[in-house]
Amino acid sequence: MDSLSQSSRLECQICFNYFSQRRLPKLLHCQHTCCSVCLSQMRLSQREIRCPWCRCVTQIPIGLSVSHLPDDPEVLSVISVSQSSEHTPIFIHLPNNGCYLLPVSLDTDGTPLPGQPTCHVGPKSIGVFDVSDGQNHVLGHDGLGDGMEEEEVVVVKTTAWTGVCTVLLVAFILIFLLGIVLHNMSCVSKRFTIISCG
């Protein structure tokens, strides 16, 4: 229940969007908190801002915007900590070797967290690389390796086999379609015979 109230405290109770750098938590004179976007919309339709809960009036001097209202320091400290700890994963497909780059969790000073490899190759040639140090390390089947020799061979073999299989599959499909066309052509030439081409 406490996490539910904490979660609702981190979102604007008007639009139900989470507070962020774009939607800053602004304190009204009555100490209720709303996001800056909702307050700006309220300010467009009214000269004064009335709290949606207690109807208390918050005056903003002419020429000033909602951004001049004080931020809610409690909520602001929570969202700044949570936003700095989060990272958005970015997946990049590398067509040369079929690897995908995934983000690596880093410490505040930019070093990898203890016990976390800077790069590893997982199933289906998925790789995670830390590009900050300029080196590529690969986690093989037996642990963290220094180079990429063995894994490069595996990736090259996988890519080669994928190409060979694709060529064989396309050739098989073309031969199958050619057989259908030749069969239909032979049936057309025997149009008036007693034997059916079924």
UniProtKB/Swiss-Prot annotation:
Principal place of residence: membrane
Zinc finger map (RING-type): 12-55
Catalysed reactions listed for this entry: S-ubiquitinyl-[E2 ubiquitin-conjugating enzyme]-L-cysteine + [acceptor protein]-L-lysine = [E2 ubiquitin-conjugating enzyme]-L-cysteine + N(6)-ubiquitinyl-[acceptor protein]-L-lysine
Keyword field contains Metal-binding: yes
GO biological process, one term: cellular response to amino acid starvation
Subcellular location: Lysosome membrane
Membrane topology: Single-pass membrane protein
Membrane-spanning residues: 162-182
CDD domains named in the record: RING-HC_RNF152 (cd16548)
Domain of life, per lineage: Eukaryota
Enzyme class, spelled out: transferase
EC assignment: 2.3.2.27
Transmembrane recorded as keyword: yes
Pathway: Protein modification; protein ubiquitination
SUPFAM superfamilies: RING/U-box
GO CC annotation terms, alphabetical: lysosomal membrane; lysosome; organelle membrane
Keywords per UniProt: Lysosome, Membrane, Metal-binding, Transferase, Transmembrane, Transmembrane helix, Ubl conjugation pathway, Zinc, Zinc-finger
Function comment: E3 ubiquitin-protein ligase that acts as a negative regulator of mTORC1 signaling by mediating ubiquitination of RagA/RRAGA and RHEB. Catalyzes 'Lys-63'-linked polyubiquitination of RagA/RRAGA in response to amino acid starvation, thereby regulating mTORC1 signaling. Also mediates monoubiquitination of RHEB, promoting its association with the TSC-TBC complex and subsequent inhibition. Also mediates 'Lys-48'-linked polyubiquitination of target proteins and their subsequent targeting to the proteasome for degradation.
Family per record: Belongs to the RNF152 family.
Protein name: E3 ubiquitin-protein ligase rnf152
